[in-house]
From Swiss-Prot:
Organism of origin: Xenopus laevis
SMART domains: PDZ, PH, RhoGAP
InterPro entries in the cross-refs: PDZ, PDZ_6, PDZ_sf, PH-like_dom_sf, PH_domain, Rho_GTPase_activation_prot, RhoGAP_dom
Protein name: Rho GTPase-activating protein 21-B
Gene behind this protein: arhgap21-b
UniProt key word Membrane: yes
Gene Ontology BP terms: Golgi localization; signal transduction
Length: 1902
């Protein structure tokens, strides 16, 4: 931005063309905004480069940063020279555009790989044009808008960073990391641009701008006028660098700068002769905020309004416009902020002309204008000086900061600087600091300084953005100053009324709202400085007047004092001198060496003399204090008012102020003090200041009172010696002369602060701290100066300080330096707090209330100072100091009548708890419990008091009760892990940690923001401290991560956990609950918590979600969940049956113990983390053991209720609302888990885990209560499934932000819901008796808990109660079942509904299929006949057959998708086998559907889901196809059917009728080996949710099947499914289902125990198989087969669901029937020992548990049943045979396998006729055989059985296809257990893949 040319030295050389220079007479803002291109042209870039970017989805891929560049001093000086040379011409009145601040925009960051990166855009490139449109003159926001509004392509013209003059010149500033001083040697400093900055001699070195005197009529004016501007002739400003900090955002100002001059930028009070007075400042004056005392606004207005029209008629609105260019003000201004005349172009030409002489003053060697970079060791110094001269030392960064609203409440930009106090200490340009020494000081780039010294900024035309951001800098003057001015004026100083100086000029002090919004942003502290500065600048006219240096000495002293006074301003001595010069025409012009302090005092005094500056009002205005000739400076504040002058005036002032600015600095400092206690200052001023003339004549005399306050004489500008602490200009000048103790000398803020701290300490020791003193000691402006520089300053009464600030007069002198001096205490003046102005005496008592901003400033300074003080370098030391000062400040603030205006930036009651001691050791909650404290945030310290203190006399030492916490460089964040309390934030200092609890979140955030802002006041210290803390925190975190501790952050939890109960109680109450308890509930919780089982440190299992170690990327998600889910997603998405197959219990237990020990350093590469089944079981175990389940106990009933809503849309909406209402940890964890489960379900084709299967596994685990409510477990199981399934299916909708869109519901979901409301839990009742662990105890099968869950309920007591419950449930169930026997009751459970639904669908589908397949019809007919016969048999005992048939189907389905198959299979099978005739068409369809569901998921789909699938896609499948496809289940089919019938199915497989529930339950109980999943379910009192997919569906199916079986033959298929799934599920569910079955219903219900089961089994076996002699053998074989997976063969028959077989069924059905008959006979012959079968089942269950072998066994049983069903076609005789086979099934599996093998051989032979089918069958058989051979002999039997079953099923009902499904299921089950569901390739060779089975059977059938 050429405009910033000033920044670019070379370019800067080129004067901007007049065109580009917009007359400054116009608002600077306008100019800044209107940077003319000519300026741009002035730059000699190597040339910008053009970059074209294409907009991508994420945008253009780069971010910008905004810098406001202020013109180099040289440029300003050049313009000044031009003016001096008479070149003002048209532009004379206004600074050139190039001198205007320029908005520069740089590329902050380029996203790698983004469009910008590809286009070659680089970080640091400066944007010149956007789409061909120059950015010059545009605000940052406008440029951003241009970019954002560009089309798909964006053309940028950029200046590469390495070619950008601005960046080269301001390399450090541009990328300032704080305001770090340049650390390199001069040689390393980048060469300044070739442009040589002309050593412009400050023309108005004094910068004595004619002070505009407000009309005496104006109270302000009067006040101000009383003191003519002290034309403190500034010495050459060489080291003068005015750093005016921009106050933080206006809000800050309001917050902190309650003080005077609320005129933020909004109010630019222009001190204009009354005629010209424009209420610019007043308009701009920010009255907002307490800053404006009620009167304040008026004063500012008055100031503006009252500018003496007569006195300064010619002066433009700009108050102290440099009327006296001659005074050098103009010249100075350029150096000052470049404001010089340019800024004050508005000033009348005459004034401008006058300025030349001042310029000459500038010319003085010290003057900044001469600044030549070659004179400085480092470029940075040069820049700093130049900047000081020109911009008030504001760096770009500073300006940016201010623009950014100084996110940090850098109240004291300088305070941060104080850190630099060290040799390099960056001082806010204290006058002395400003000395070339400035090199020592941290150098800021000009822009930085600008930022620091908003005053200058204000005077500068702001860049467009700045303007937009802040009101004219001038406009805002220190509110504090203004306030105190006003107050002073109002109070004692109504006298402030503009006095007519002896010279007759009226001293009208226009208050400048010295602070721009930036100032405000910056913070009160800065403001005070700035304010002071502004005052000095603005008041220069006045302020200077008050302290007019009679000669250059005065001027110089004044300037210097100002500079020192204005901590922010680093003024070169010359510059400072110049500023005073502004006040004094003559003295200001004469660049005299600073007068001795006495001279200064003289200057301060010589109001009229200085005032005599050409601008009449300039002289007058300067005397803010109305010093009548009597020499009493009544109104120092007027100076401030002067500052308030309009922007133009401000410009002039700025120049003047630049000279004065330094002066002002001192003034400002004093002013800050004075602002703090305006009354004090006023009084002081009055006391101190004699008539301006008198003072002028006798500055010493005036200062004499100040003698106590020893102003240090600033080293000559040329001196490199560490600049003495900047004296407040007047005071220094005066005092120095007097040689009063240096104590009075104004130190840079740091020094002052140190001194102040020391004083405070002394006072504390003495117990007396005069508020005034404390103020005085506290540099208002945290002007960094080396503390060492600060000589022990005698306490400068705050009042003195204030006075000084108010009027350069050595008001300070008046105040006794002694800390105790009752000097008017500076009271904070709150806008409301006018009494702040109360008599000094009162104020003394009450630590003067400073205006809030003043106090804050002081406090900040103090605190910063403390921290910043070299001595305070150590945080602890600093803290101590802070404690002292802050306490003082805080007390003063406390004293302040109004808290709002108190020094505190924020205060209020907080609960507080210390986490660590000074040594960093953790403090237990019992030792340091939560306490309610009144917390006051002052500056960089927090004061903790037991209660709110309002006493005004606190300025003395902080009370013992008060605890001080230094927050410089602290880290503050929201605490989540340290306590369970809400709204807690943690404050970490260098050595301690504290927790604070706020009332609500907003309050907490407000505190955090305030503390962050106040803790960042000292750049260097803050940065260093923050770095230390951050590194410390990182170390802690790393330690925590590497150690076994689970705590992410050191947390008191561990200690609390180890505490005794009493201690826990004591600690827990404050720690965990908001104290004190508000109600009984709270007390109860408090009482309960200590006794609740506290998780061990770092515990993961069995602890609340919010206590679990958080994941690395989401603090709300437990680490274990994150790790397990990621591992499964990385490695297990293709693992068949993931989550269904349990892991090794021992491994799971071991990992749980390890994680519970707090080991969060998980090495996922470790072998133990390689077993996915263990990992999946670990995850399930975690959720099972949650004390508060994922869906929370509180909302459990709501979820169940919501799930049962009729309207699916309403249901989903309600569920979503409930989910959103979950606690954060629960919500985020649920969101994460459901997303993971959705990911798993998306891979269901490979892993066979459709949403329904996952829901079966996770439903009871996630949706549960902590209580062992078996009824809920059973009755709500379908709801639990459905809720989880819905979550998985609609994860995106549930967890998306947009909830407006209506959820999309599917038919199957709705049907499921419909089926859910009244789940039939009869089949679960037996399970309840058998198994029962509390949900918490329920463990994954892999976990040790699983055994417990299976083995027992838990403690004896619980067991007993459970038994009672179980017995009652059984009785109810038995009654129900009896009824069901009479008629098929569609149980409320989804299973039954699904079955019914499925049957309907099947019938439809089947009908369709028959149409498709001609063969199907015959088969269907046969199947129907079979089904009918089966029904009859089933009714009789043929149910077993039906069940078998169904089981085949079910197995096929259930194994592929266990949940659905039971239901689906049952109806289809019933339809096919039993009801074949009636449902001829349905059968094929059903088979197909079954095949689909089975093949799809590799597990049985629940019936309802299958039904829905069927409904969704009815189709005919060729037998082969069916065989393979049956397994493929639609996800939809899975969804609707949540059956808990896995055990039932198992029973069905065995022929649930034959096997009594007891037997089944026994088998299941014995089969504790049953899937861990099942055990999990059982343990939870829920159907086995664990690994076997079929468990629940089977249950549901079997229940339904039993009912249906009783009523229909459908039930058997479900039972088959159960079997396929595994005996365990069967056992659990089957007992009930079998009870439903007519035989066992009552008996089984009663008999839950193993004996009963065994008996029933035996009975069944006996009844079923008359020829069971072979049963034992068969049984053993079957057992082996089962163990090895023979069940697969059984499953296969089930898999041969008739739906698939429709086409073949006619043929195959008959064949199968024949075969079945034969096989039935064989089976009967093979073995009919039911007991053996039961044992086999048990074994199978065992296997099932690990593998789904049990299911396979059941599958075999199912196959038998299927054969029986096939036989039913032959007739009930066959059914009886089948029945016999059923008892034999377990053992007969082997025999059956053999039989099947034989049969297959025969079949194959017979079927060879159908070569292809036969071959296929043979291959299948062969495959089976191979697998069998691969596996032990048992496996081969199983294979045989598998083959047999398929054959059997095929012949009866085209079950060949289904059979493969079953087989697949069996395989899949085993696979599932082994995480391998692939039917074709099974982990167990003895298992045949579903496809193989299907093929073999198919061929056999053929």
């Amino acid at each position: 931005m050429a405009t910033r040319r000033a920044i670019v030295p070379e370019q800067q050389q080129e004067p901007s063309s007049p065109a580009s220079e917009i007359s400054k007479n116009k608002d600077w803002q306008e100019q800044s905004e209107m940077v003319s291109p000519t300026e741009e042209e002035g730059f000699c870039w190597p040339g910008p480069k053009s970059v074209a970017l294409r907009r991508a989805s994420e945008g253009f891929g780069f971010t910008l940063r905004h810098f406001i560049v202020y013109p180099p001093e040289s440029a300003v000086h050049t313009s000044v020279k031009d003016e001096e040379n008479g070149n003002r011409g048209v532009n004379a009145g206004r600074p050139r555009n190039r001198l205007e601040p320029m908005d520069t925009i740089f590329v902050k960051q380029v996203k790698e790989g983004g469009p910008a990166h590809e286009a070659g855009l680089c970080t640091g490139d400066r944007i010149i044009k956007v789409n061909g449109e120059s950015v010059i003159g545009k605000t940052y926001s406008q440029v951003i808008a241009l970019i954002q509004n560009s089309d798909s392509t964006l053309e940028l013209s950029v200046m590469p960073k390495d070619e950008d003059i601005l960046q080269l010149a301001y390399s450090q500033d541009a990328y300032l990391k704080g305001n770090d001083s340049y650390s390199g040697n001069a040689q390393n400093i980048p060469e300044p641009p070739p442009l040589c900055y002309p050593r412009v001699q400050p023309e108005a070195s004094v910068m004595a701008q004619p002070v505009e005197v407000l009309p005496s009529g104006t109270s302000l004016a009067t006040q101000q006028s009383s003191c003519p501007l002290r034309t403190a002739t500034t010495q050459p400003e060489r080291s003068y660098r005015v750093e005016i900090q921009v106050p933080p955002s206006p809000t800050d100002i309001v917050k902190s700068n309650t003080a005077v001059c609320v005129c933020n930028e909004a109010v630019r009070t222009v001190i204009v002769p009354s005629e010209k007075v424009v209420d610019l400042s007043s308009n701009r004056t920010n009255r907002a905020g307490p800053l404006h005392r009620t009167g304040l606004a008026d004063p500012s207005i008055l100031k503006r309004t009252t500018s003496p029209s007569s006195s300064t008629p010619n002066v433009p609105m700009v108050p102290s416009t440099r009327h006296f260019d001659s005074a050098g003000v103009i010249g100075k201004p350029p150096s000052y902020g470049g404001l010089a005349e340019n800024m004050f172009s508005t000033r009348p030409a005459a004034h401008a002309e006058e300025s030349p002489s001042p310029t000459n003053h500038y010319a003085s060697p010290g003057s900044h204008q001469h600044i030549d970079w070659r004179d400085y060791k480092t470029y940075k110094e040069y820049i700093d000086n130049r900047r000081m001269l020109m911009y008030g030392c504001r760096t770009i960064q500073e300006r940016l900061d201010s623009l950014r609203a100084a996110s940090q409440n850098t109240t004291d930009y300088n305070q941060m600087l104080p850190n630099r106090s060290s040799g390099q200490v960056r001082r806010r340009s204290t006058s002395h600091d400003r000395v070339p020494q400035s090199a020592q000081m941290r150098k800021r780039s000009v822009s930085q300084e600008r930022l620091e010294d908003p005053v200058l900024m204000k005077e500068w035309p702001r860049s467009a953005s700045q303007d937009t951001l802040t009101s004219p800098a001038v406009a805002s003057r220190n509110h504090r100053s203004e306030l105190w001015d006003y107050l002073t004026r109002k109070g004692d100083f109504d006298q402030f009324i503009v006095e007519t100086h002896s010279n007759g000029e009226r001293n009208t002090n226009y208050q400048w709202s010295g602070f721009t919004e930036q100032d405000d942003r910056r913070g009160i502290n800065e403001r005070p400085r700035q304010h002071a500065f502004h005052m000095s600048l603005r008041s220069p006219n006045f302020t200077m007047a008050p302290v007019p240096f009679t000669s250059s000495d005065n001027r110089r002293g004044g300037a210097r004092v100002l500079a020192s006074a204005h901590p922010l301003q680093m003024v070169h001595p010359d510059m400072k001198t110049i500023q005073p010069t502004r006040n004094f025409q003559n003295s200001s012009r004469a660049p005299h060496p600073r007068p001795a302090l006495s001279d200064r005092s003289g200057f301060a005094i010589s109001k009229s003399n200085s005032v005599k500056i050409p601008t009449p009002y300039a002289a007058k205005p300067h005397s803010p204090s109305v010093r009548s000739d009597d020499g009493i400076v009544r109104d120092q504040k007027p100076v401030n008012y002067l500052h308030v002058g309009g922007p133009q005036n401000c410009q002039r002032k700025t120049q003047t102020e630049s000279a004065l600015g330094f002066h002002l600095d001192s003034i400002k400092t004093s002013m800050s003090a004075s602002s703090s206690s305006p009354s004090t200052s006023q009084k002081v001023d009055v006391k101190i200041t004699q008539s301006p003339e008198a003072n002028a004549g006798d500055s010493n005399a005036v200062l004499s009172p100040v003698d106590q306050v020893v102003l240090r004489e600033r080293p000559s500008p040329g001196q490199q010696t560490s600049p003495p602490i900047r004296q407040q200009s007047y005071i220094f000048a005066v005092n120095e002369q007097e040689g009063a103790s240096d104590t009075t000398c104004w130190l840079p803020n740091d020094a002052r602060r140190e001194v102040h701290i020391k004083r405070i300490e002394q006072r504390k020791a003495s117990g007396s701290n005069s508020p005034g003193d404390s103020l005085a000691s506290i540099p208002f402006i945290d002007e960094p100066t080396s503390p060492s520089i600060d000589h022990e300053i005698g306490n400068i009464p705050a009042s003195a300080v204030i006075s000084i600030s108010a009027q350069p007069l050595p008001t300070i002198t008046t105040v006794p330096p002694s800390p105790t001096s009752p000097v008017p205490l500076m009271r904070r003046h709150f806008s409301h707090d006018h009494d702040s102005i109360r008599p000094i005496v009162l104020e003394v008592n009450s630590k003067t209330e400073r205006s809030k901003s003043c106090d804050e400033g002081l406090d900040d300074y103090k605190e910063d100072g403390k921290l910043c003080l070299k001595q305070g370098s150590s945080l602890k030391g600093i803290k101590a100091r802070e404690n002292v000062q802050s306490s003082e400040d805080s007390e003063s603030r406390k004293d302040s009548s109004s808290d709002v205006f108190s020094d505190s930036n924020k205060e209020g009651f907080l609960y507080f708890r210390q986490l660590t001691t000074e040594k960093g050791k953790r403090v237990s909650g019992s030792i340091r419990p939560w306490k309610q404290m009144y917390v006051v945030l002052r500056g960089s310290a927090l004061y903790l008091q037991k209660d709110k203190k309002e006493q005004t006399g606190h300025s003395s030492a902080q009370s013992d009760e008060e605890q001080l916490i230094g927050i410089n460089g602290c880290l503050i964040d929201i605490s989540y892990s340290e306590t369970k309390r809400k709204n807690v934030f943690r404050l970490t200092t260098s050595d301690r940690e504290f927790l604070f609890q706020a009332e609500d979140r907003d309050d907490m955030l407000a505190w955090i923001k305030a503390i962050q802002e106040n803790g960042n006041l000292n750049d260097e210290q803050t940065d260093q401290a923050s770095r230390v803390l951050i590194s410390k925190r990182i170390k802690e975190y790393n330690t925590m991560m590497s150690s076994s501790s689970n705590k992410t952050e050191p947390s008191p939890k561990a200690q609390r956990q180890t505490l005794s109960i009493r201690q826990q109680f004591r600690a827990g109450k404050p720690d965990d609950d908001i104290s004190p308890p508000k109600d009984k509930g709270s007390w109860r919780r408090i009482m309960k918590k200590p006794f609740e089982k506290k998780p061990t440190t770092g515990g993961t299992f069995g602890v609340r979600l919010d206590d679990c170690p958080p994941a690395h990327n989401n603090k709300y998600v437990p680490l274990i969940v994150d790790v397990c889910c990621k591992l499964v997603e990385d490695r297990g998405l293709e693992t068949t049956g993931i989550y269904r197959v349990p892991g090794n219990n021992a491994a799971i237990s071991s990992m749980q113990e390890e994680l519970n020990k707090g080991n969060t350093d998980i090495d996922i590469q470790d072998d133990k983390w390689r077993d996915l089944n263990v990992i999946s079981s670990l995850l399930k175990s975690f959720f099972r053991k949650l004390p508060d389940p994922l869906f929370t106990n509180e909302k459990y009933n709501d979820f169940i209720e919501a799930n049962r809503k009729e309207d699916p849309v309403e249901r989903l909406k309600t569920l979503k609302r409930l989910i959103l209402d979950l606690p954060d940890h629960h919500y985020e964890t649920l969101k994460y888990l459901s997303a993971h489960l959705k990911t798993v379900a998306d891979s269901s084709e490979k892993n066979k885990m459709e949403p329904r299967n996952l829901a079966i596994v996770f439903g009871p685990t996630l949706v549960r209560t902590s209580e062992d409510n078996m009824t809920h477990m059973v009755t709500h199981m379908p709801d639990q499934y459905k809720i989880v399934e819905t979550l998985i299916q609609k994860h995106d909708w549930f967890f998306s932000e947009e909830s407006a869109d209506e959820p999309i519901t599917t038919v199957h979901e709705e049907s499921t819901v419909e089926s859910q409301p009244v789940p039939n839990i009869d089949h679960l009742l037996p399970n309840i008796g058998r198994t029962g662990l509390s949900p918490g105890d329920v463990s994954d099968s892999a976990t040790s808990d699983s055994a417990k869950s299976k083995g027992s309920w838990g403690s004896g007591k619980d067991q007993y109660s459970r038994e009672l419950l179980v017995s009652s449930l059984f009785a109810a169930a038995s009654r129900k079942r009896k009824k069901q026997k009479d008629k098929p009751q569609p149980s409320s459970s989804e299973d039954e509904l699904d079955n019914v639904f499925y049957q309907k669908e099947l019938s439809q589908v089947e009908f369709q299929k028959p149409d498709k397949q001609n063969v199907d019809k015959d088969m269907d007919l046969k199947a129907k006949a079979n089904a009918l016969s089966l029904k009859d048999a089933d009714n009789v005992k043929g149910t077993n057959i039906i069940k078998e048939d169904k089981l085949e189907k079910d197995i096929m389905y259930s194994e592929p998708t266990s949940p659905c198959p039971p239901k689906l299979l049952e109806p289809p099978i019933a339809n096919h086998g039993l009801q074949a005739p009636s449902n001829d068409k349905n059968i094929p369809q059903i088979n197909f559907q079954m095949e689909e569901s089975m093949s799809d998921s590799g597990t049985m789909l629940s019936t309802s889901s299958q039904a829905s699938v069927q409904g969704s896609k009815p189709k005919v499948v060729s037998p082969e196809f069916k065989g393979s496809d049956f397994l493929t289940a639609d996800v939809s089919s899975i969804t609707s059917d949540y059956s808990t019938t896995s055990s039932t199915i198992y029973m069905t497989g065995l022929d649930s009728i034959l096997i009594s529930p007891e037997v089944q339950s026994v088998a299941e109980s014995k089969g504790e080996e049953a899937d861990d999943e099942r055990s999990e379910l059982v343990s939870e009192g829920r159907p086995m949710e664990t690994d076997s997919e079929n468990d629940f569906p089977i249950f549901a199916s079997s229940l339904a099947f039993d009912r249906r079986h009783q009523s229909k033959a459908e039930e058997p298929s479900r039972n088959v499914q159960v079997n396929s799934e595994g005996s365990p599920s069967c056992t659990e569910g089957s007992i009930t289902p079998k009870m439903d079955r007519r035989r066992f219903s009552s008996h089984k219900l009663i008999e839950c125990d193993t004996l009963s089961r065994k008996k029933s089994v035996q009975q069944k076996t006996d009844s079923d198989c008359s020829a069971e002699s072979k049963t034992e053998e068969t049984l053993s074989d079957a057992q082996e087969a089962v163990k090895k997976g023979r069940s697969l063969s059984i499953v296969d028959p089930t898999g041969n669901n008739e739906p698939e077989e429709p086409a073949w069924r006619i043929k195959i059905t008959e064949r199968l029937k024949l075969r079945l008959k034969a096989s039935a006979d064989d089976m009967f012959g093979i073995g009919s020992q039911k007991a053996n079968a039961a044992e086999t089942r048990k074994k199978k269950n065992i296997r099932r548990r690990h593998t789904l072998g049990g299911h396979r066994d059941f599958a075999e049983i199912s196959v038998l049943n299927a054969w029986k069903i096939n036989e039913p076609s032959s007739k009930e005789a066959e059914l009886s045979a089948v029945d016999r086979l059923k008892p034999k099934c377990p053992s007969q599996d082997l025999s059956i396998s053999e039989w099947l093998v034989r049969e297959r051989l025969r079949t194959s032979t017979s079927e060879l006729s159908t070569v292809e089918p036969e071959e296929k069958h043979i291959s299948e058989t062969t495959g089976q055989k191979e697998s069998a051979s691969a596996s032990p002999p048992p496996s081969s039997p199983s294979q045989v059985s598998t083959a047999v079953l398929p054959a059997g099923s095929d012949s009866p009902s085209h079950e060949t296809a289904p059979q493969p499904d079953d087989q697949m299921n069996g395989d899949s089950f085993q696979s599932k257990n082994k995480n391998n569901f692939s039917p074709a390739v099974d982990a167990h060779p003895h298992k045949l893949s579903g496809t193989q089975v299907v093929r073999s059977r198919f061929y056999q059938y053929l």
